[in-house]
Amino acid sequence: MSFESNEYFDGNVKSIAFQSATLPGTLGVMDIGEYTFDTNAYEFMTVVNGALTVKLPGATDWKTFNAGETFEVEANVSFDVKVKVQTAYLCLYK
């Protein structure tokens, strides 16, 4: 088995794809900045270290998720993220 690595936003977001015991996922890092992500599948995003400030589809307010916290994003939508410190995350896809 091999791992697939990806880079987005000029290398400011990097991830490594893997197959967990239950769902496919990625483990990644984000540099300081603001990003808009598109989803292809339902996502469970957990902050491993650092923090992500997120504006989910249909939301009017931003919400900050810290280490150990998880948010969910529907498939086939876009969501916005602000990163104030380099942050590690785990994303599982359903």
Curated annotation (Swiss-Prot):
Top-level EC class as recorded in UniProt: transferase
EC number(s) from the headed UniProt entry: 2.4.2.1, 2.4.2.2
Transmembrane segments: none
InterPro entries reported for this sequence: Ppnp, RmlC-like_jellyroll, RmlC_Cupin_sf
Single GO MF annotation: purine-nucleoside phosphorylase activity
Keywords associated with the record: Glycosyltransferase, Transferase
Catalysis: reaction(s): a purine D-ribonucleoside + phosphate = a purine nucleobase + alpha-D-ribose 1-phosphate; adenosine + phosphate = alpha-D-ribose 1-phosphate + adenine; cytidine + phosphate = cytosine + alpha-D-ribose 1-phosphate; guanosine + phosphate = alpha-D-ribose 1-phosphate + guanine
Keyword Cell membrane listed: no
CDD domains: cupin_PpnP-like
GO cellular component: cytosol
SUPFAM superfamilies given in the database record: RmlC-like cupins
Functional note: Catalyzes the phosphorolysis of diverse nucleosides, yielding D-ribose 1-phosphate and the respective free bases. Can use uridine, adenosine, guanosine, cytidine, thymidine, inosine and xanthosine as substrates. Also catalyzes the reverse reactions.
Assigned protein family: Belongs to the nucleoside phosphorylase PpnP family.
Name of the protein: Pyrimidine/purine nucleoside phosphorylase
Protein source organism: Psychromonas ingrahamii (strain DSM 17664 / CCUG 51855 / 37)
